[in-house]
Amino acid sequence: PTLAVRNGHNTNQAKGYSYLYWKDFFNPRQQLCLGLLLREILKIKNKKIQEQFLCLFSSTLEFNNSFCSYKGEGTGAVRPIFFNHILKPERTPLENSVWGEPQSSGCFSTLYKTRFLKAKEYLNYPFEIKVNKDNNKYEKVISSQPLRPIFVDNWNDLTNTNDSVWVLNGDSARLPIPDNSVDLVVTDPPYFDYIHYSELSDFFYAWLSPILENRYPEFQADTSERANEV
């Protein structure tokens, strides 16, 4: 990645330690290994599958950089870069294995099993967690039929197509849907100024924008910052 670190609340924390480009967050060996992995992902001809693996690659970045450390004392799991939402370098950074092996933490091969395959399994067997009050144990309860949504890109198709889903990524203050058409709103509350998502998302944007800029206009900007964001 060649993207420079822009000024900001969180990014200035790293710039104070002379981390001026996002590539500086990775040592030369990590840059090489991640670059080789990314090159192989880009050989996948099916773009939908390729982009799923690009999402998995972005998760791998969190656990393979110079800001990682051990979780807890001793040689435990790998603690990723954003575990405490600041960009302060570790005194003794932990260098992880990019590809990994069965007992690894935060590696591409293990994240493939724990995140990618788990998500696919959930689509086939959606579940809820039930708590047994007698022994305080948890169990999974299959809660619906397999999820096989049909993705649409407008309101008319959404209302006229069974089992359809319309995914929007934009300004929630101006949704292109009719008034009084929403039955339920489920929201994840923001953290106000605790986490500066736009600044921190440049960590991933630096790797993905050169690949996706010719597919999606949203990736053509120099950074992930947008003029109308809060």
Q: PLM ranges: what are they?
A:
Residues 185-186:
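Hydrophobic beta-strand segment of the Class I
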Residues 1-178, 196-230:
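Nucleic-acid modification enzymes, centered on SAM-dependent nucleic-acid methyltransferases
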Residues 190:
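Conserved SAM-binding loop
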